[in-house]
Amino acid sequence: MFKKLSLKGSSNTNNQIKSSLQRNIKNSILAQYPKLKDIEEDVFPKKVPIVQVKCQNHINLVLINNEVLFFNEREGPYYPTLRFLHKYPNILPHVQVDKGAIKFVLQGANIMCRGLTSPGAKMEVDLPVDAIVAVMAEGKDHASAIGVMKMSTNDIRTINNDIGINNIHYLGDSLYMSPNLE
């Protein structure tokens, strides 16, 4: 999604939004990620406005204290950024790819089923289609990518062919390389 996105000069509008829309965004994010309820004050401090930046390709960035924390495409679900996920790693379920898939994940490729079922890979939680996941790499501590399940974990294990996870945001893409918009 962010392979070719240039954030410098690409934003159409950079507005502090109305308080009702701020509440809607905050409530939508909290409903989507219930584990954030415990750290709500850290993520959404009082008296700090939420800024929404609209970029090319219908991508909206959610900024708090000039730091990009979440993004979405059109009116779709909100995804956390990798920097935010590294601060709060338990807000998303984890899947792990094997060592052979790491290079391709870091280049923005979608994750194939075989990279999730081979030795070294892990899928410990049963996940449905369209679940947002943190993609971990074998032998690494932090998430390498954020993706959306294109098959359930049971289907990935049984079919073991085709794309299992769509890679949405990965280490080294343009969003990761520019965490602040100034």
UniProtKB/Swiss-Prot annotation:
Single Gene Ontology BP annotation: formation of translation preinitiation complex
Domain PUA: 92-172
Lineage: superkingdom: Eukaryota
Entry GO terms, CC: cytoplasm
SUPFAM superfamilies: PUA domain-like
CDD domains: MCT1_N, PUA_MCTS-1-like
SMART domains: PUA
Pfam families documented for this protein: Pre-PUA, PUA
Molecular functions (GO terms): RNA binding
Similarity remark: Belongs to the MCTS1 family.
NCBIfam families: unchar_dom_2
Domain notes: The PUA RNA-binding domain is critical for cap binding, but not sufficient for translation enhancer function. MCT1 N-terminal region is required to enhance translation possibly through interaction with other proteins.
Name of the protein this chain belongs to: Malignant T-cell-amplified sequence 1 homolog
Organism: Dictyostelium discoideum (Social amoeba)
